[in-house]
Amino acid sequence: MASGRRAPRTGLLELRAGAGSGAGGERWQRAVLSLEEDALTVSPADGEPGPEPGAQREPEPAQLNGAAEPGAASPPLPEALLLQPRRVTVRKADAGGLGISIKGGRENKMPILISKIFKGLAADQTEALFVGDAILSVNGEDLSSATHDEAVQVLKKTGKEVVLEVKYMKEVSPYFKNSASGTSVGWDSPPASPLQRQPSSPGPPPRDLRDAKHMSLKMAYVSRRCTPTDPETRYLEICSADGRDTLFLRAKDEASAKSWAAAIQAQVNTLTPRVKDELQALLSATSTAGSQDIKRIGWLTEQLPSGGTAPTLALLTEKELLLYSCLPQTREALSRPARTAPLITTRLVHSGPSKGSVPYDAELSFALRTGTRHGVDTHLFSVESPQELAAWTRQLVDGCHRAAEGVQEVSTACTWNGRACSLSVHIDNGFTLWAAEPGAARAVLLRQPFEKLQMSSDDGASLLFLDFGGAEGEIQLDLHSCPKTMVFIIHSFLSAKVTRLGLLA
């Protein structure tokens, strides 16, 4: 009787095994890839076994700027640099940023670490920074207890000259040298994500492929844009959902790489409904999230301010966009996303070709801006297909409108003409300004519908300007904090009202 399971797809590809000491600067091992319904199996190709059991592995020296030059061995890091902090001045060009990627942060119980240095950009040109360097401070601002997002914001706001205080972390550098260059973190590493490991226990370095190894396809990350400088685009990167395992593969040509990526992604997609159901059960049991429904889940590739990229798992609910570095598998992990963007204060500002310099297919990118009490957060993401781009952009816009219709009204304290007031903004009733002096009756000072609003603006600090025309003209409200949250909510209400009238598709 037939089992009902289709035969796995198999093929011969190359697996990146790590940095080599020869002229090539890196080693590739032929491997047989077998795609099954829920897993990917990688086996040594016939005639190309891994090293003999018990064979000595040459120690891998620290690499200058995280990459070996073709035709030369990796230069070892001077021993003196391992013992003391260093100050490195980076001078940024007019375009390109610092040219580094970072990992770690307080939420991962690790310092902020340089995980990749991009060839030819500002950090690389110093010849004084290394993959595995911990960033202790930026222009004197301490990062020793910073979260990943806080560090990104500090680096993003730097000027043309940046002074980095760094210290090389020998214990964790093997993970970042390998993951930054697209190599595997090692099949035999202990069952914990390298980013969540203590620096004192980094685990073994990556090993050659000796036996068949298996990677679960459950919510795996699949990308073809991990080597932007490759003119043939024949590389694949597959990461497990928990971030423990990474496969960096090379196909014979672009068509083969595209075919394999599509086939692997199709299998991942068949498993996604099961993952969605599991997360929905966890979300329903998480008191902070209430009973929100999950509208969409999937991997995005985020463009970082440093110029690198990072896989980001996005979970879209009725009210929020939740972003994670790996698949949350417990209620605690689900309740602690790396970032949260309330949909009512989030705006899709770009979809399609990017105007900036993006090291991957900018045709499949989109940008989001979120108004917060600290200002505006902007994030650029890309996906793997036009279908994904259309689905994400449509659901994000619809989600913003649903959130606006659900909230209906928001209020905030403010000052108008020296008087303490309360501003209420209602999706149907418009703007109402109430007197809010202690002991005074709650009196309406001003009421205007949305239809009368001719222009709105803010100073980015605390002032909101609303122009309703007529005798009243423009009014100035002091919200006592950054007005961006209220500005974005007003935009969401307006957009939802226009869509409700059928003026937008």
From Swiss-Prot:
The keyword Cytoplasm applies. The keyword Cytoplasm applies. Pfam families: PDZ (PF00595), PH (PF00169), PH_17 (PF18012), Syntrophin_4th (PF23012). It is found in: Cell membrane, Sarcolemma; Cell junction; Cytoplasm, Cytoskeleton. Monomer and homodimer. Interacts with the dystrophin related protein DTNA; SGCG of the dystrophin glycoprotein complex; NOS1; GRB2; GA; TGFA; MAPK12 and the sodium channel proteins SCN4A and SCN5A. Interacts with the dystrophin protein DMD in a calmodulin dependent manner and with related protein UTRN; SGCA of the dystrophin glycoprotein complex; F-actin; calmodulin and with the other members of the syntrophin family SNTB1 and SNTB2. Interacts with MYOC; regulates muscle hypertrophy. Interacts with DTNB. Adapter protein that binds to and probably organizes the subcellular localization of a variety of membrane proteins. May link various receptors to the actin cytoskeleton and the extracellular matrix via the dystrophin glycoprotein complex. Plays an important role in synapse formation and in the organization of UTRN and acetylcholine receptors at the neuromuscular synapse. Binds to phosphatidylinositol 4,5-bisphosphate. Belongs to the syntrophin family. This is Alpha-1-syntrophin.
